[in-house]
Curated annotation (Swiss-Prot):
Its main location: nucleus. Transmembrane segments: none annotated. Component of a Polycomb group (PcG) multiprotein PRC1-like complex, essential for establishing rod photoreceptor cell identity and function by silencing nonrod gene expression in developing rod photoreceptor cells. Via its association with the PRC1-like complex, promotes epigenetic repressive marks H3K27me3 and H2AK119ub marks in nonrod genes, silencing their transcription. Represses Crx-controlled photoreceptor-specific gene expression. It is linked to Macular dystrophy with or without cone dysfunction: A form of macular dystrophy, a retinal disease in which various forms of deposits, pigmentary changes, and atrophic lesions are observed in the macula lutea. MDCD is a progressive, autosomal recessive form characterized by reduced visual acuity and macular atrophy involving the fovea. Some patients also exhibit mild generalized cone dysfunction. It holds the Pfam family SAM_1. Monomer, homodimer and homooligomer. Component of a Polycomb group (PcG) multiprotein PRC1-like complex. Interacts with PHC2, NR2E3 and SAMD11. Interacts with RNF1 in a PHC2-dependent manner. This is Sterile alpha motif domain-containing protein 7. The SAM domain mediates its oligomerization and localization to nuclear polycomb bodies. The keyword Nucleus applies. One of its GO terms (molecular function) is histone binding. It comes from Homo sapiens (Human). It comes from the Eukaryota. GO terms for biological process: negative regulation of DNA-templated transcription; negative regulation of gene expression, epigenetic; retinal rod cell development. Residues 187-207, 225-277 are annotated as: Disordered.
Amino acid sequence: MAVNPLLTPTGQQTIPLIPSPFGPPTVDRDVLPSTVAPTDPRQFCVPSQFGSSVLPNTNMANVLSSRIYPGWGILPPESIKAVARRNEMIQRHHTARTEMEMYAIYQQRRMEKINPKGLAGLGIPFLYGSSVPAAPAAYHGRSMLPAGDLHFHRSTLRNLQGNPMLAATAPHFEESWGQRCRRLRKNTGNQKALDSDAESSKSQAEEKILGQTHAVPYEEDHYAKDPDIEAPSNQKSSETNEKPTTALANTCGELEPTHRKPWGSHTTTLKAKAWDDGKEEASEQIFATCDEKNGVCPPVPRPSLPGTHALVTIGGNLSLDEDIQKWTVDDVHSFIRSLPGCSDYAQVFKDHAIDGETLPLLTEEHLRGTMGLKLGPALKIQSQVSQHVGSMFYKKTLSFPIRQAFDQPADTSPLLDPNSWSDTMNIFCPQDTIIPKGIERGSMRN
């Protein structure tokens, strides 16, 4: 029979034993009732600061709930460093989520300030994708976009500006853009100018577009000094009207503004100087017979950019008008050999049997790792091929949106005003994609 250690044997003086302060208190099995005492002699000791010791038995639910505090268990306690690291990670997640929500609210307020209907009123297709209709009805009449649609990564805008394949592959971009712009212009009419913040951002956007314009200075001055293209008296500023119009026209292949000076039946020759020596001159017919019904000429391909002179004529058998996918291995060899600084690697392309179908698929890793090219020639070849492919897609998709571009009469409002977009924005430029001013401001601030 077990003896209580707190009691002495019969006949001796009872002296209570003081438990050690350094060890956990224990409870004898005979002190507890039979319903509580477990069959296993092992005991589960709890330090005194968490209550008296109890035993792990299935019949002790009430005892455990009143004696043991949350967080106490049989597992070893977690280290302080791990707890601090976990708390810091959770705090970072909460902070990042809060910043994203605040930025979304800020973007919404700014879009509402520029356009009361929000971006859904503009109906920009690439915000939602080709599968979702670009209309406010898609969101059941809500006047603003969800918070997730306001986060545009900067690389997305760069790809839209620099890679024409993203927007040229789907004709839905040109169709819905032109229809929504014309509808927006009819509904809004003559609206008041925006506040000073919007005007300052407009001037910044004008300077950026003018800086990117690859125009001949003489033609730009000629458009500015022509008395027939004076801004109407009801416009707020002639400078705000003239410069963006000229910049957009010159950027999109030296195309004159459709709403300022109707063209007659004539042809014009543009002379482009070669980039390397400045002596060669290649003349192109850029305007054909104009449409006498509405006095508008169809737009023409842009002149070659600096550095693309090798794409104009290569050995007399390759030109910009030819499809790059039809090139043979010898054509690719001639193309690489004609590029300045890349003639030494032309034989490498021929040894690897690179033709017109595989040339656009080459990446920098292929050129440098597999074919052994240096960084400069590899980047130059990639740039020339991308410009060639972009001009090819541009010419293929040019004829389709132009028929809708001139269905409506032209407007005399500024091109950069989001309340009255001009029809000339239907003309798709591969290198200079026009985007709304609100998104442009967001990308410039980022």
